[in-house]
């Protein structure tokens, strides 16, 4: 009996580890339930982040665009101006390379100049928000504020009168030069190439009248020089007096003959 009791005791002791192992298995399953709760929390956080992003995007869409600074506008204007000038320069080089007559070249230059002025005006309007009516009004030059020929952009008759005076003052500074006459001849010819025939006739008539007046003045100067020479050999003052009386019949066939007839 003692052996059977010992066997029973031996068989009884191993039961406790089995219970512990079973308990261990139960604890492991309980941990799995907790992990599932953590995953659910992560999903909630991700959904909240997505909602926050959507709200931020809506706020960014509703937010009005910021106004550009004046310095940024000026930089944009300079870039556009540079690009426009490069295009105009390229067009000028292309026009010069072609076989054009002098008149056609001048017309092309005038066209390109007009395009450049229009482009400058358009850039100013876009960059600074200038009213088109105000921009057109500003093309009329205020002569009191003009700083020289470069500042002139004549459009009215009075503007051209002022422009004429400034050009005259500029050009006549060099009238003492020996090259001045040839310079004017070439300048007038180049300036008059694009004119119509009727306009050329007016200019030609005006210059012809000026030539006649200058010739008349020159003759008068020569006559005055001769009178200032004084007594001329071969009769002098008496001879001149005799010539004056000769206009009224002279000494031979004038008053003397009338006196003989009376007698």
UniProtKB/Swiss-Prot annotation:
Q: Where are the transmembrane segments?
A: none
* Region named Disordered: 1-75, 214-235
- Regions of biased composition (Basic and acidic residues) lie at 51-75
- Keywords noted in UniProt: Coiled coil, Cytoplasm, Initiation factor, Protein biosynthesis
One GO term describing the cellular component: eukaryotic 48S preinitiation complex
What GO terms describe the biological role, i.e. biological process, of this protein? formation of cytoplasmic translation initiation complex
Specify where it is mainly localized.
cytoplasm
Which portions of the chain have biased composition (kind: Acidic residues)? 1-13, 30-50
Location(s) in or outside the cell: Cytoplasm
Q: Does the keyword Metal-binding apply?
A: no
Give start-end ranges for the coiled-coil region(s): 30-127
For this protein, the record's InterPro entries field holds:
eIF3-like_dom_sf (IPR023194), eIF3j (IPR013906)
Q: Which GO terms describe its molecular function?
A: translation initiation factor activity
- Quaternary structure and partners: Component of the eukaryotic translation initiation factor 3 (eIF-3) complex, which is composed of 13 subunits: eif3a, eif3b, eif3c, eif3d, eif3e, eif3f, eif3g, eif3h, eif3i, eif3j, eif3k, eif3l and eif3m.
To which protein family does this belong?
A: Belongs to the eIF-3 subunit J family.
Q: What does this protein do?
A: Component of the eukaryotic translation initiation factor 3 (eIF-3) complex, which is involved in protein synthesis of a specialized repertoire of mRNAs and, together with other initiation factors, stimulates binding of mRNA and methionyl-tRNAi to the 40S ribosome. The eIF-3 complex specifically targets and initiates translation of a subset of mRNAs involved in cell proliferation.
UniProt protein name: Eukaryotic translation initiation factor 3 subunit J-B
Supply the source organism for this entry: Danio rerio (Zebrafish)
């Amino acid at each position: 009996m003692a052996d059977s009791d010992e066997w029973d005791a031996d068989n009884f002791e191993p039961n406790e580890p089995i219970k512990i192992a079973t308990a261990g298995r139960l604890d492991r399953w309980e941990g799995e339930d907790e992990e599932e709760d953590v995953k659910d929390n992560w999903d909630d956080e991700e959904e909240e982040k997505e909602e926050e992003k959507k709200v931020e995007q809506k706020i960014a869409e509703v937010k009005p665009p910021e106004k550009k600074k004046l310095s940024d506008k000026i930089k944009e204007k300079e870039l556009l101006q540079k690009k426009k000038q490069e295009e105009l320069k390229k067009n000028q080089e292309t026009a010069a390379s072609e076989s054009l007559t002098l008149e056609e070249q001048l017309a092309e230059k005038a066209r390109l100049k007009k395009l450049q002025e229009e482009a400058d005006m358009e850039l100013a309007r876009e960059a600074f928000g200038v009213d088109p009516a105000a921009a057109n009004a500003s093309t009329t030059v205020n002569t009191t504020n003009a700083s020289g020929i470069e500042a002139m952009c004549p459009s009215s008759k009075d503007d051209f009168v002022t422009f004429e005076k400034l050009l005259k003052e500029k050009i006549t500074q060099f009238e003492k030069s020996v090259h001045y006459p040839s310079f004017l001849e070439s300048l007038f010819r180049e300036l008059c190439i694009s004119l119509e025939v009727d306009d050329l006739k007016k200019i030609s008539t005006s210059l012809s009248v000026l030539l006649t007046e200058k010739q008349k003045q020159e003759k008068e100067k020569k006559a005055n020089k001769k009178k200032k020479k004084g007594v001329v050999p071969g009769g002098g003052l008496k001879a001149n007096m005799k010539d004056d009386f000769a206009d009224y019949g002279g000494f031979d066939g004038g008053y003397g003959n009338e006196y003989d007839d009376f007698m």
